[in-house]
Amino acid sequence: MKKIKLVMVGNGMAGVRTLEELLKLNSDFYDITVFGAEPHPNYNRILLSPVLAGEQTFEEIVLNDLNWYAKNGIKLLLDRKVVQIDRVRRRVVAADGSEAEYDRLLLATGSVPFILPIPGNRLQGVIGYRDIADTQAMIDCARTHSHAVVIGGGLLGLEAANGLKQRGMDVTVVHLSDWLLERQLDRTAGKLLQGALEARGIRFRLNTQTQELMDNGSGRVCAVQFNDGDVIPADLVVMAAGIRPNTELAESAGIPCNRGILVNDTLQTYDPRIYAVGECANHRGIAYGLVAPLFEQAKVCANHL
């Protein structure tokens, strides 16, 4: 029997879990091709913070090594960002010109960091915190620079601040709210957490809005200016002010999106040949960012595929 061609765009935790579930059900049904925008096999993004802090290595957080893909007959194309979906010819095209035809297409493009729309947000030294490349950039910067500013006092921002402090940087966290983790903690608990982190040497600017990132003409960030006029030095600025579903590819192909790629209860998009799982998908008005519901999506999607 001729195998059905399944192409997956994205090589993260939700997408690869879908493949694992699919292989459990029937390992011979699909001819699978995976495009990964990063030059790495699937790894655990949740553990990037221990890597930043020097508690784990990149190798230790890999979930599916290259041998796993080969053993399961999966064609893995790393460092290939897909830039086009041709829904008529049923094929995807990557930035380097490589392409693959599909009978079924699985979009697992994840999310992208929200970069504040302020002057200087494209300067060298201004990064999000989402992947191995971001983590490595922070580790490299900590070796040669001193001052880090983390924008965002949520969990991700505090993990970045803690890791950078452990790497020896002088760290300031800037947060819009009156206290840290305001969605998870009340004021009292937030202030207790702040005190514990201040005891580790991390500084805080709460109820503060970032107005501009400055470079003094060098092309690299050197300072942060706030809405009250204060300026502090910054060799590194980490944007940890939230994420957005990565829908750019789907939208360019005319697939309906609204704060995520719109999917039904079987994770099918408005194009019946195309599915979406993970942080890029919007199911009944919700784009999930936690692992447990994303793994449930993977199971449902695999069963329907």
Which stretches of residues belong to each language-model region?
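Beta1-alpha1 glycine-rich phosphate/pyrophosphate-binding loop at the start
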Residues: 2-75, 163-184
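Phosphate-coordination loops involved in phosphoryl transfer and adenosine-cofactor binding
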Residues: 3-5, 79, 144-147, 207
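Short hydrophobic core segments
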Residues: 9, 100-110, 151, 232-242, ...
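Residue-level detector of alpha-helix initiation sites
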Residues: 13-16, 39, 111-113, 133, ...
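A Rossmann-like FAD-binding core segment of flavoenzymes
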Residues: 31, 76-94, 100, 167-264
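A conserved beta-strand/loop capping segment in the N-terminal third of enzymes
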Residues: 67-120
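Glycine-rich dinucleotide-binding loop and its adjacent helix/turn
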Residues: 109-167, 263
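FAD-site-proximal beta/loop scaffold in flavoenzymes
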Residues: 122-144, 215-225, 229-303
